[in-house]
């Protein structure tokens, strides 16, 4: 265990549920986090902002929150701003890091300006001439492509497009989820990886090998045939360097304390960062518990470690 007296945390709210497209995942994460904290002796209580006003946190004497909300107002800076207003310490990034981290478009703009490698991309706005934009994008980026709403997590509405004819429909589908759509060149040849970040813990990279085309919502939260390779199979020196770049990708967005940075390798071993996640899933399929377990850190110890980061100035 961490050696922290659980009484130091005071009364803790585990925020989960919410109203985003990721509500069901958040409910699962939150229940497990709640149990993990209670197992460690923390005075933790469930709190679903979809069912109760946030003012109840202050009224009921909560001093700290473990944010297990995913997507929407739980991850885009809004809940963080409210918690700041009420003077409640919380896990994860603050307003700026959360807002940028959930916005794939602005994430990529920051990375381009700070030297973090990211796949070439184009943006499409809801209301654009999709057929014309599709033709232009294929000419610029080639195929295959990934189409993503700019501000959804858990691979909600992410589509892999292999033919030019399929692109307009994919754009239309993504535009129902967000007014900005990202179209990204698919990086092929080296596989998908994630770097889990939790304070000063040195967690291993995970190589993700989905049974399907890519690591989509089903592969993340439903399927049991996705492979998670720990160790990831890369040389130690390369893994260390990739973890350093991942931490930089996280830091330049203003993200703090804990999260994930996802990236692809091409056939030559070059990394291209896709996104960060400032409120990672904590289900039994999720990546941070897997990375922690690989270095001997159990679920309860991990959530206490994450919560302990709120004790820092």
UniProtKB/Swiss-Prot annotation:
The protein's role, per its UniProt record: Cell wall formation.
InterPro entries: ATP-grasp, ATP_grasp_subdomain_1, D-Ala_lig_Van_CS, D_ala_D_ala, Dala_Dala_lig_C, Dala_Dala_lig_N, PreATP-grasp_dom_sf
Chain ranges passing through the membrane: none
Record family assignment: Belongs to the D-alanine--D-alanine ligase family.
UniProt cofactor(s): Mg(2+); Mn(2+)
Protein name: D-alanine--D-alanine ligase
Domain of life: Bacteria
GO biological process, alphabetically ordered: cell wall organization; peptidoglycan biosynthetic process; regulation of cell shape
Binding-site list for Mg(2+) 2: 275, 277
Main location: cytoplasm
Catalytic activity: 2 D-alanine + ATP = D-alanyl-D-alanine + ADP + phosphate + H(+)
Domain (ATP-grasp): residue spans on this chain: 108-308
Signal peptide: none
One GO location term (cellular component): cytosol
Species the sequence originates in: Burkholderia cenocepacia (strain HI2424)
MF terms in GO: ATP binding; D-alanine-D-alanine ligase activity; metal ion binding
Residues at which ATP binds: 138-193
Pfam families membership: Dala_Dala_lig_C, Dala_Dala_lig_N
Record text on cofactor binding: Binds 2 magnesium or manganese ions per subunit.
Pathway assignment: Cell wall biogenesis; peptidoglycan biosynthesis
Binding site for Mg(2+) 1: 262, 275
Lineage, opening ranks: Bacteria, Pseudomonadati, Pseudomonadota, Betaproteobacteria, Burkholderiales
Classification via PROSITE patterns: ATP_GRASP, DALA_DALA_LIGASE_1, DALA_DALA_LIGASE_2
Classification via NCBIfam families: D_ala_D_alaTIGR (TIGR01205), PRK01372.1 (NF002378)
Location(s) in or outside the cell: Cytoplasm
């Amino acid at each position: 265990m961490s050696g922290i007296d659980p009484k130091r945390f005071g009364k803790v709210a585990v925020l989960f549920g919410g109203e985003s497209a990721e509500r069901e995942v958040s409910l699962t994460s939150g229940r497990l986090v709640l149990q993990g904290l209670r197992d460690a002796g923390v005075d933790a209580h469930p709190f679903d902002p979809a069912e109760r006003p946030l003012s109840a946190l202050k009224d009921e004497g909560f001093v700290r929150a473990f944010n297990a909300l995913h997507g929407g107002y739980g991850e885009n800076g809004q809940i963080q701003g409210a918690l700041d207003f009420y003077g409640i310490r919380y896990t994860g990034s603050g307003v700026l890091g959360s807002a940028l981290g959930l916005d794939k478009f602005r994430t990529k703009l920051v990375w381009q300006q700070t030297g973090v490698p990211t796949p070439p991309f184009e943006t499409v706005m809801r209301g654009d001439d999709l057929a014309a934009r599709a033709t232009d994008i294929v000419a610029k980026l080639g195929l295959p492509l990934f189409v993503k709403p700019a501000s959804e997590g858990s691979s909600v509405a992410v589509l892999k497009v292999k033919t030019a004819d399929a692109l307009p429909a994919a754009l239309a589908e993504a535009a129902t989820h967000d007014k900005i759509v990202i179209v990204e060149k698919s990086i092929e040849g080296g596989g998908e990886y994630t770097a889990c970040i939790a304070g000063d813990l040195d967690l291993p990279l995970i190589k993700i090998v989905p049974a399907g085309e890519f690591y989509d919502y089903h592969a993340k939260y439903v399927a049991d045939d996705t492979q998670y390779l720990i160790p990831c199979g890369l040389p130690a020196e390369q893994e260390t360097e990739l973890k350093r770049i991942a931490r930089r990708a996280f830091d330049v967005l203003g993200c703090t304390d804990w999260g994930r940075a996802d990236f692809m390798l091409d056939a030559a071993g070059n990394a291209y960062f896709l996104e960060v996640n400032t409120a990672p899933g904590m289900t039994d399929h999720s990546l941070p518990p897997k990375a922690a377990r690989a270095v001997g850190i159990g679920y309860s110890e991990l959530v206490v470690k994450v919560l302990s980061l709120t004790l820092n100035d």
